[in-house]
Amino acid sequence: MIFDKVNYKEFDKEVWEAIQAEEKRQQNNIELIASENVVSKAVMAAQGSILTNKYAEGYPGRRYYGGTECVDVVESLAIERAKEIFGAKFANVQPHSGSQANCAAYMALIEPGDTVMGMDLAAGGHLTHGASVSFSGQTYNFVAYNVDEETGLLDYDAILKQAKEVQPKLIVAGASAYARTIDFAKFREIADAVGAKLMVDMAHIAGLVAAGLHPNPVPHAHITTTTTHKTLRGPRGGLILTNDEELIKKINSAIFPGIQGGPLEHVIAAKAVSFKEVLDPAFKDYAQKVIENSKAMAEVFLANPNFKVITGGTDNHLFLVDVTKVVENGKVAQHLLDEVNITLNKNSIPYEKLSPFKTSGIRIGSAAITARGFGVEEARKVAQLTIKALENAENEKALEEVRQEVRALTDQFPLYEGL
């Protein structure tokens, strides 16, 4: 067979070397990007399997191509496991991403031009919750709700008042940078009060929901969407859940043939494997440690007057920090920390005064370091090293000390043994 005997390390040296460099980067860097995680070898193996060869438009038992009996088994397993994890009656595991899951949910719930309320991007929302640069803001009439300017917390009374004024057809709950527990039951009350549907995007907290450590939105939302990576620790992809039989029909049609063609069955296999991992009791222990590590890091920042932790702490895997007392902006902080092998992202904070390309804040997440085995002691050390770097931006000696301590930590907790 053509190319079947080719050693790709030699055939495509450029790609091989880039992959090796990325493996080295991940091994030697402390990963604090809240949307990233470290998948298991089993998940990687499933995603790299022979299923990548198979085209399978449609759904299990209802395909447009033949030879789908094996991928039907895999996709059915993924569906059943997702339903079991979140207590949902129906699931679609085909979305290629969380954004596509959200797109399909909108298509199932509303019409172009309808009014929708979504969380303000700077307050912690997501691009697909109505940002003008996103399909969501360009297709629907999104009106943003915000957080309290003093506390940074969701103000449900203010959201209800705004909903009564706006009269949306849909309310979107969920966030990409909100550190506190979200009351989905309260959001449903607000939606019901104005005759709106409720959609929840739980992409960031899905792993915590799965472990029973954050309220489950599925009983309250008409549709719940999520990614399958982040705190779920699976492959990159999307998932849609609902308890409504009529809505799952609309969701399925919106995904295929609406916005996607053939599903990525190798990725769905990886989703199935990761869902089985989530169902294992060990996953709850992992998720609990994710929260403990996040709180431990936040406490270190809270104790330092040079930094402001938005909302005054965290209930989940992430928190935001205003860094403008020590560096010019979040972009500068991100680049500075890159130099000492600590990876995170600049992030807008509520009522942001700087552009989204600079920002006043950084976002810090604990999911990836926890997957590597970091505990509370190491998490505190990571926060201390982050602060040391930010407070010594012009001190090369101090920055080199941080690099060395980062390397000591990453050597102590290998990314993958024998990869």
From Swiss-Prot:
InterPro entries: PyrdxlP-dep_Trfase (IPR015424), PyrdxlP-dep_Trfase_major (IPR015421), PyrdxlP-dep_Trfase_small (IPR015422), Ser_HO-MeTrfase (IPR001085), Ser_HO-MeTrfase-like (IPR049943), Ser_HO-MeTrfase_PLP_BS (IPR019798), SHMT-like_dom (IPR039429)
Top-tier EC class: transferase
Superkingdom, taxonomy of origin: Bacteria
Assigned GO CC terms: cytosol
Any one GO BP annotation for this protein: tetrahydrofolate interconversion
Cysteines joined through disulfide linkages: none
PROSITE patterns according to UniProt: SHMT
Catalysed reactions listed for this entry: (6R)-5,10-methylene-5,6,7,8-tetrahydrofolate + glycine + H2O = (6S)-5,6,7,8-tetrahydrofolate + L-serine
Amino acids binding (6S)-5,6,7,8-tetrahydrofolate: 121, 125-127, 246, 355-357
Keyword Nucleotide-binding appears in the UniProt entry: no
UniProt site positions, description: Plays an important role in substrate specificity: 229
Cofactor(s) required, per the database record: pyridoxal 5'-phosphate
Enzyme Commission no: 2.1.2.1
Pfam families noted in UniProt: SHMT
GO molecular function annotations of the record: glycine hydroxymethyltransferase activity; pyridoxal phosphate binding
Assembly and binders: Homodimer.
Similarity annotation: Belongs to the SHMT family.
Function: Catalyzes the reversible interconversion of serine and glycine with tetrahydrofolate (THF) serving as the one-carbon carrier. This reaction serves as the major source of one-carbon groups required for the biosynthesis of purines, thymidylate, methionine, and other important biomolecules. Also exhibits THF-independent aldolase activity toward beta-hydroxyamino acids, producing glycine and aldehydes, via a retro-aldol mechanism.
The protein's name: Serine hydroxymethyltransferase
Annotated organism of origin: Streptococcus suis (strain 05ZYH33)
Source lineage: Bacteria, Bacillati, Bacillota, Bacilli, Lactobacillales
Gene giving rise to this polypeptide: glyA
